A protein has these predicted regions:
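Transmembrane alpha-helices and membrane-interface helical segments
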Residues: 97-101, 143-153, 176-181, 321-335, ...
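Membrane-embedded alpha-helical segments of multi-pass membrane proteins
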Residues: 89-97, 136-144, 163-170, 190, ...
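Residues in well-ordered beta-strands of folded domains
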Residues: 304, 319, 350
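Aromatic-enriched
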Residues: 324-393
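Transmembrane helices and adjacent periplasmic/lumenal helix-loop junctions
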Residues: 160-177, 308-318
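Sec-dependent signal peptide recognition
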Residues: 10-11, 171, 340
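Short amphipathic alpha-helix initiation/capping segments at coil-to-helix junctions
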Residues: 292-296, 308-320, 329, 335-339
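Primarily membrane-embedded glycan-assembly and transfer machineries that use lipid-linked glycans
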Residues: 2-156, 180-313
C-alpha cells in the first residue's frame, strides 16, 4: 500500500530539481567550464591540424584518448560559451533519456516513478552539479553504461565500448557480456573499443603510436595526490595512517597535520594492495554469481570506483543507480520500517550537505579529508548488496 505522504513526493521533487537546475545554471555561467576548457582546446588543435600536440599544448593536463579529441572536435566550431552550453544541454537530454531507460524497473505504482527518478537525481545533486560546473563527462558515461546494461542491445554496447576507451573508468563494465555469455554484445563492445582506439589512424595520423604513448604518459603523470579533493579509499588510508601533512584545499596552500602516524609506507602499500584485491574479488563474485538484474548492474557500476587511486567528486554520479534502487524501496515504507530511512538520510547528508557552504571551512575540510563522499558511496553499496541478498529491492 502506498503511504499517504507519497502525494508530496512529486511537488517536492519538482521543486528540488528546479532549485538544482537554477543553481547549476548560475554556477556554470559564473564560474564554470574549467575541465571543458581543456577539452575545447584539444578539439581546436585537432581542427587546426595540430592533433599531435593535444598532450603537450594544453591549459591543463589533457587525460582523455586521442579519439575523444578527434570525434568530438566539431564542437569547437562553435564559440566556447555556446559549445559549453550545448555540452551541458546534451547532459540534460541524456538524463531525460535515462528516465525512460529505467522506467521498466519502477517497482511501485508507475504514477510514482517520476518523483522516484527526481529524488534519485537529488540524492546525487552535489556530484551532479560539479559535473555540470566543470564540464566533465561522467554523466555521459553513466547514461551510456545504464543504457547498455538495461537495454542489452548490440548498438548500446557498441557505443559503450567507444566511450569506455575515451575515459577508461568504465572499462571493467565491458567484462559483463563476456561473463554472461552474450556473444553479440561482447563483440559489439570490443568493436566499439577498437574503433575508439584506432580512430586517429582512420584520419590518417602518421604519429598514431606516439599519440597513444603520450596518452599513457599523461595518465601515468597523474600520480597519487593525497589532497583532500581525492575521495578514494586508498588516499584516505594514507591520509589517516601515514602521519604525513596533507593539503586540505579549503584551508589554503600550506599542508596541515591530519591523521595518525600508525603505519609504515610498506604497510600502507600492502593495505592498498589488499583492498584492491578484495574489491576485485567482490566485483567478480557479483559478476559471476548473481543473475542478470538491475540490482546486479547497479552494484557493478558502483564498485568500479572502489579500487581507484584517484576519485574526484563528480565521479559519484555513479552512485545514482544505487540510490534509485534503494529509494525505490524506502520511499514507500510505513510504520516501524521507517527507521531504515535513517542511514540513507545520513548518506544523503554525507554526499550533499558537507560542503563549506553548509558547515563552514573548518568542518567541511575535515569531512573532505575523511573522503566523506566515498563513505556515503560505500554505505549505499553495503545497503544495496545486503538488501539484494535478503530480498528483492
Amino acid at each position: 500500500m502506498i503511504p499517504k505522504y507519497a502525494r508530496y513526493f512529486l511537488p517536492s521533487g519538482l521543486f528540488s530539481v528546479f532549485v538544482l537546475m537554477i543553481s547549476g545554471i548560475w554556477i556554470t555561467t559564473q564560474r564554470g567550464g574549467q575541465d571543458f576548457n581543456v577539452f575545447y582546446h584539444a578539439w581546436k588543435l585537432v581542427l587546426s591540424g595540430q592533433a599531435s600536440d593535444i598532450y603537450n599544448n594544453s591549459p591543463d593536463r589533457f587525460l582523455y584518448s586521442p579519439s575523444f579529441a578527434c570525434l568530438l572536435s566539431p564542437l569547437a566550431w562553435m564559440p566556447f560559451h555556446i559549445s559549453f552550453l550545448f555540452w551541458n544541454t546534451l547532459k540534460i537530454i541524456s538524463l531525460v533519456l535515462l528516465f525512460f531507460i529505467l522506467k521498466p524497473y519502477a517497482k511501485n505504482d508507475n504514477s510514482l516513478y517520476l518523483p522516484l527518478y527526481l529524488w534519485s537525481l537529488i540524492f546525487i545533486s552535489r556530484p551532479l552539479l560539479i559535473d555540470f560546473q566543470y564540464g566533465q563527462i561522467n554523466i555521459f558515461l553513466l547514461v551510456f553504461s545504464l543504457w547498455a546494461l538495461c537495454s542489452q542491445t548490440t548498438l548500446s554496447w557498441f557505443f559503450l565500448g567507444i566511450v569506455a576507451v575515451m575515459k577508461p573508468l568504465i572499462l571493467p563494465l565491458l567484462l559483463i557480456p563476456w561473463f554472461e555469455r552474450r556473444k553479440a554484445a561482447y563483440i559489439s563492445s570490443l568493436a566499439g573499443a577498437l574503433l575508439s582506439i584506432l580512430f586517429p589512424v582512420v584520419l590518417g595520423f602518421q604519429n598514431f603510436q606516439t599519440l597513444l604513448s603520450q596518452w599513457y604518459n599523461a595518465l601515468a603523470s597523474k600520480g597519487f595526490p593525497l589532497e583532500s579533493h581525492n575521495q578514494s579509499v586508498l588516499a584516505l588510508l594514507y591520509r589517516l595512517f601515514s602521519g604525513k601533512p596533507i593539503h586540505i584545499i579549503s584551508y589554503g596552500p600550506e599542508p596541515v597535520q591530519f591523521g595518525f602516524n600508525l603505519f609504515s609506507e610498506k604497510t600502507l602499500f600492502l593495505l592498498c594492495i589488499a583492498w584492491i584485491i578484495a574489491v576485485l574479488v567482490f566485483f567478480l563474485k557479483i559478476l559471476i554469481t548473481q543473475k542478470q538484474s538491475i540490482q546486479k548492474y547497479a552494484l557493478l557500476v558502483g564498485i568500479i570506483l572502489l579500487p581507484l587511486h584517484l576519485v574526484w567528486k563528480p565521479y559519484f554520479v555513479f552512485s545514482f543507480p544505487l540510490a534509485f534502487l534503494i529509494l525505490r524501496d524506502l520511499l514507500f515504507l510505513q510504520g516501524r520500517k521507517m527507521y531504515k530511512l535513517f542511514p540513507i538520510a545520513l548518506t544523503f547528508t554525507f554526499m550533499n550537505l558537507t560542503g563549506l557552504d553548509y558547515i563552514g571551512t573548518s568542518l567541511s575540510g575535515k569531512f573532505e579529508a575523511l573522503s566523506i563522499m566515498m563513505l556515503a558511496h560505500l554505505i549505499l553499496i553495503f545497503y544495496a548488496y545486503t538488501a539484494a541478498n535478503h530480498k528483492d529491492l
